[in-house]
Design a protein with these regions (language model features):
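Active-site-proximal loop/helix segments of hydrolase catalytic cores
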Residues: 191, 246-325, 346-347
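Phosphate- and divalent-cation-binding pockets in alpha/beta enzyme and binding domains
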Residues: 187, 211-215, 283
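Metallo-beta-lactamase
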Residues: 1-171, 206-274, 295-301, 351-371, ...
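Active-site-proximal loop/helix segment associated with metal-binding centers of metalloenzymes
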Residues: 147, 242-267, 384-407
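Binuclear metal-ion centers of metallo-dependent hydrolases, dominated by the metallo-beta-lactamase
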Residues: 202, 217-235, 290, 305-308, ...
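Active-site metal-binding motif and surrounding structural segment of the metallo-beta-lactamase
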Residues: 156-204, 292-298
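Active-site neighborhood of phospho(di)ester-bond hydrolases with catalytic His/Asp-centered motifs
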Residues: 142-143, 174-183, 204-207, 272-278, ...
């Protein structure tokens, strides 16, 4: 095909894709009152870092040429995949299978189920998507809390919940620490943050993200901004922001001043890892060597696509990352709650179970809202199959899902634990949080105190 003809053909393709996109947007507009057409919750865009917070961002070794950089070269979108082609895929491909065919069997969590301390000292409750309540030795940590109906700056459009929240936020009870992995709408929810800010929680966030929280009314002294490999001690826990392979984007204008991260949370008896959103990179083994082994890992297994293969794990990659981290029990998350990728709704669970069985990994796949203790994980019963929109005659990836395998998978040697440092016995004010900043080959080498900008002040 000659070059002019090729360009004409491609222009025709793009025009067709644009037509499909505009058709679907037009249908959405037709169902709305006219006064809703331009209604945008502009506060949800957040705010850019300023002052001391911006100074900390600019001084990060991971901030290069005006924006944060990933641990390895990364493309948010794969080459050859135009935004219009992406939108066409998300809107048109296999649409009937991207949502459940019936109501998701959510476990209606009652406050009484959380009133008794866990026997082992560690309990996890997956509340949907990346939201997990972790109870570690009497301290309650809430990861990436999202209670809103849509993950969008709009009230009328954007990814909508596929199942209700298992527990109203008002019934959750006190939260000690809120941990945010990055500023995407499905991980950082303005309305949920504002509600949680009415309590006494301290908010741990990656560098720059605290600007959003402060814009929404969270007092600066309650915000702890951390760079990769920095740690803070809160309420007897040590929280460390660890690298991830992703990106941030929230407002109408691009900004590279917000960091993304995974998280390590340690008590005197237990260790947890939360992946946030991330693509595959070699750093999982490094994190496992420094901080593992982990009692449980919470791993992103959904919202993957050939369009963005470098910024979201596939289920198979998530299982391998769990092994590299030295995890004992893996909790798959970031699937089943919002329709964010072209894959079928149930596919992340099926592929995760298949990969875990092949690798001999202990898996816990509870219904949303069902608490469990990693010391005694529940059998991996495939509850999702009852509501999946699986075509007649289609084969499932895992015909049977047996009980979990033993905690130490065959052929897996757990990483050596990192030397423990003293943990605070009582919850300090965020302005007095001690931070630990490890070097590449050392567990830790310096400490500072948290300033009013929400981040550690390094000693002169």
């Amino acid at each position: 095909m000659s070059r002019p003809v090729s360009w004409l053909f491609r222009a025709g393709e793009l025009a067709a894709e644009a037509g499909l996109l505009l058709r679907d947007v037009k249908r959405s507009y037709r169902t709305l009152p006219r006064e809703s057409w331009h209604r945008v919750r502009t506060d949800a865009f957040g705010a850019d870092p300023r002052g001391k917070r911006l100074h900390r961002v600019s001084g990060s070794p991971h901030f290069v040429d005006g924006s944060f950089r990933n641990p390895v070269p990364t493309r948010p979108l794969a080459y050859g995949h135009t935004p219009l082609a992406l939108m066409r895929t998300k809107l048109a491909v296999d649409g009937g299978r991207r949502s459940p065919a019936a109501a998701v069997p959510v476990h209606r969590l009652l406050p009484a189920e959380l009133s008794t301390p866990p026997e082992s000292g560690l309990r996890l409750t997956w509340l949907g998507h990346a939201t997990v309540l972790a109870e570690l030795d009497g301290v309650r940590v809430l990861f990436d809390p999202v209670w809103s109906e849509r993950v969008s700056p709009f009230d009328w459009i954007g990814p909508k919940r596929l199942h209700p929240v298992p527990l109203p936020l008002a019934e959750l009870g006190p939260v000690d620490v809120v941990v945010i992995s990055h500023d995407h709408y499905d991980h950082l929810d303005m309305d949920t943050i504002r509600t949680l800010a009415a309590g006494d929680a301290v908010f741990a966030v990656p560098l720059g993200v605290g600007a959003h929280l402060e814009h929404w009314g969270v007092e600066p002294y309650r915000i702890v901004d951390l760079d990769w490999w920095e740690s803070a001690e809160l309420d007897g826990l040590r929280l460390t922001a660890t690298p991830a392979r992703h990106y941030c984007s929230r407002g109408p204008r691009p900004s590279g001043k917000f960091l993304w991260s995974s998280w390590v949370v340690e008590s005197k008896r237990h260790r947890l890892f939360h992946s946030g959103d991330t693509g595959w990179f070699p750093g999982f083994a490094d994190i496992g060597h420094r901080f593992g082994p982990f009692d449980a890992t919470m791993m992103q297994v959904g919202a993957y696509s050939e369009h963005w293969p470098e910024v979201h794990l596939t289920p198979e990659e998530a299982v391998q990352a769990h092994r590299d981290l030295g995890g004992k029990v893996m909790l798959p998350m970031h699937w089943g709650t919002f329709n964010l990728a072209p894959h079928p709704w149930e596919e992340p669970a099926e592929r995760t179970v298949a990969a875990a069985q092949a690798a001999g990994v202990t898996l816990a796949v509870p219904r949303p809202g069902k608490p469990f203790e990693p010391a005694d994980p529940p059998p991996a019963a495939p509850w999702w199959r009852a509501v999946a929109a699986t075509p007649a005659g289609a084969d499932v990836l895992v015909p049977e899902a047996p009980s979990p395998v033993p905690d130490t998978p065959a052929g897996l040697t757990a990483a050596a634990p990192r030397p423990d440092a003293p943990l605070a016995a009582a919850k300090p004010a965020a302005s007095a949080v001690r931070t630990v900043e490890p070097e590449a080959a050392a567990a830790e080498h310096s400490s500072g105190r948290s300033g009013q900008d929400g981040g550690p002040v390094r000693p002169a």
